[in-house]
From Swiss-Prot:
One of its GO terms (cellular component) is EKC/KEOPS complex. GO terms for molecular function: ATP binding; hydrolase activity; protein serine kinase activity; protein serine/threonine kinase activity. It catalyses: L-seryl-[protein] + ATP = O-phospho-L-seryl-[protein] + ADP + H(+); L-threonyl-[protein] + ATP = O-phospho-L-threonyl-[protein] + ADP + H(+). Keywords: Activator, ATP-binding, Chromosome, Cytoplasm, Hydrolase, Kinase, Nucleotide-binding, Nucleus, Phosphoprotein, Serine/threonine-protein kinase, Telomere, Transcription, Transcription regulation, Transferase, tRNA processing. GO terms for biological process: tRNA processing; tRNA threonylcarbamoyladenosine metabolic process. Gene3D superfamilies: Phosphorylase Kinase, domain 1, Transferase(Phosphotransferase) domain 1. Component of the EKC/KEOPS complex that is required for the formation of a threonylcarbamoyl group on adenosine at position 37 (t(6)A37) in tRNAs that read codons beginning with adenine. The complex is probably involved in the transfer of the threonylcarbamoyl moiety of threonylcarbamoyl-AMP (TC-AMP) to the N6 group of A37. BUD32 has ATPase activity in the context of the EKC/KEOPS complex and likely plays a supporting role to the catalytic subunit KAE1. The EKC/KEOPS complex also promotes both telomere uncapping and telomere elongation. It comes from Chaetomium globosum (strain ATCC 6205 / CBS 148.51 / DSM 1962 / NBRC 6347 / NRRL 1970). The gene is BUD32. Coiled coil: none annotated. It is found in: Cytoplasm; Nucleus; Chromosome, Telomere. This is EKC/KEOPS complex subunit BUD32.
Amino acid sequence: MAAADDAQFPPPKVLTYPASTPPTLITQGAEGRLYKTTHLTRDRPCALKYRPPKPYRHPVLDARLTKARLSSEAKVLERCWREGVPVPAVYAMDPAAGWMMMEWIEGIPVRVGINEWLGDRPEEGAEIPQVADETPIVDLMKRIGAAIGALHKTGVVHGDLTTSNMMLRPRGFNPVDGAPGDEGKAGSVEGDVVLIDFGLATQSMSDEDRAVDLYVLERAFASTHPRAERLFATLLESYKSTFKKASSVLIKLEDVRMRGRKRSMLG
């Protein structure tokens, strides 16, 4: 199947040059592919996001949409990176060719880290018992809340906040030489939280948009980590302490929750 896909949608030309490190396909979705390769030198890993042409769309329209979406994502990432939000740095891009090269984030998804941490705890009930404030999982929730607070403070909403779109990068990791950090074993909830996959991100100062961002994460968290659902309140507290306009966002969040419950009741 992969070979057939490669024949139909070959990698972008930038990955076929003789000096390029052979790329590794990491993920493939309806809208694009993510490859792991290198940037400038063979010991500097990077991620290359590629949006191949869509045969079902008119070529001119497809080219315009691809260019607009990649350019928008790059602008959002650059804005976040300048403001100190933990996101991948953009190294290079060619919107006309449909690709963007970014910093490779070493580590594991937050989703994996939380589930591994929960897997080490006995399942005595539907939820984990109350945990102490200083436990690693609580500290992780605080770091996630702070990262989202920094994102919203910058005037950006992610659009698809889930624990799969967050990485735990080992502290002390050097992206230039690939030197390992202090952590990184699977299942650890230690490390720096890095937000990834900004394909649906927009620039917005709206409390409503920010509240929807949080609601999407809250629903995804409850679905993916039901035993740790009560810890989401810790995330919101950290968000509030990081972002001074959070109070009005959290009020809007209550409205969004109410609308969500009504939709659930109506089917």
